[in-house]
Amino acid sequence: MNPLLEIAEVSVGQHYYWELGGYELHGQVLITSWVVLGILAVLSFLGNTNLKSTPDGFQNFTELVTEFIRDLAKTQIGEEDYLKWVPFLGTIFLFIFVSNWSGALLPYRLIEIPNGELAAPTNDINTTVALALLTSISYFYAGISKKGLGYFSRYVEPAAFLLPINVLEDFTKPLSLSFRLFGNILADELVVGVLVALVPLIIPIPIMLLGVFTSAIQALVFATLAGAYINEALADHH
């Protein structure tokens, strides 16, 4: 088989399973997640070594990213409460951003595994659901820590008959977050894989560049919505 066709082969729904305590884990997702965490750890180390009062070099870049995340949190959550949520939103944004870009830029397809293929961690629904559930837990924590059990009064405001709708909303938020991210990243990698198989030289390049752009947008959308949900939980309801 043509080597390009082997690289372009798309394996949908196939997984490299690891057995742990009687449970099957998606091994390829854990491998690529560790790669992403390793990249973030290295970048963090480089950005926090030999700090200077007047930043230069890589410190400039890390401070720019930190300011961007801080401004995002401030815009979405508000002046009063945003600082304590900067680490959470920063972690979510950076993990998704690097995960998405790793799928677009790293040559995962050149690495053979016993079954399935390596891809961005966010290409697996388990990863995106976990991130969405963390977001749900965070906004419940935000609301309860500020208002106590009075937080749950929001379910019957402005009228008691809205209770089922308000409860349903808490289930649809993580669903929409997880499926939006998963669908976009999976679709991008499938389109690139098919185009590489059909026209392997030039045509896939613009699609790959578009994928890099949309990958960054998806990380921003996820972090922005997470901040908006936290702000909603913290806000006073009347």
Curated annotation (Swiss-Prot):
It is found in: Plastid, Chloroplast thylakoid membrane. One of its GO terms (cellular component) is chloroplast thylakoid membrane. F(1)F(0) ATP synthase produces ATP from ADP in the presence of a proton or sodium gradient. F-type ATPases consist of two structural domains, F(1) containing the extramembraneous catalytic core and F(0) containing the membrane proton channel, linked together by a central stalk and a peripheral stalk. During catalysis, ATP synthesis in the catalytic domain of F(1) is coupled via a rotary mechanism of the central stalk subunits to proton translocation. CDD domains: ATP-synt_Fo_a_6 (cd00310). The gene is atpI. In plastids the F-type ATPase is also known as CF(1)CF(0). The keyword Chloroplast applies. It comes from Chlamydomonas reinhardtii (Chlamydomonas smithii). InterPro entries: ATP_syn_F0_a_bact/chloroplast (IPR045082), ATP_synth_F0_asu (IPR000568), ATP_synth_F0_asu_AS (IPR023011), F0_ATP_A_sf (IPR035908). Its main location: plastid. Keywords: ATP synthesis, CF(0), Chloroplast, Hydrogen ion transport, Ion transport, Membrane, Plastid, Thylakoid, Transmembrane, Transmembrane helix, Transport. The chain crosses the membrane at residues 27-47, 86-106, 125-145, 190-210, 211-231. The keyword Heme does not apply. It is a multi-pass membrane protein. This is ATP synthase subunit a, chloroplastic. F-type ATPases have 2 components, F(1) - the catalytic core - and F(0) - the membrane proton channel. F(1) has five subunits: alpha(3), beta(3), gamma(1), delta(1), epsilon(1). F(0) has four main subunits: a(1), b(1), b'(1) and c(10-14). The alpha and beta chains form an alternating ring which encloses part of the gamma chain. F(1) is attached to F(0) by a central stalk formed by the gamma and epsilon chains, while a peripheral stalk is formed by the delta, b and b' chains. Belongs to the ATPase A chain family. GO terms for molecular function: proton-transporting ATP synthase activity, rotational mechanism. Changing residue 231 to G: In strain: CC-503.
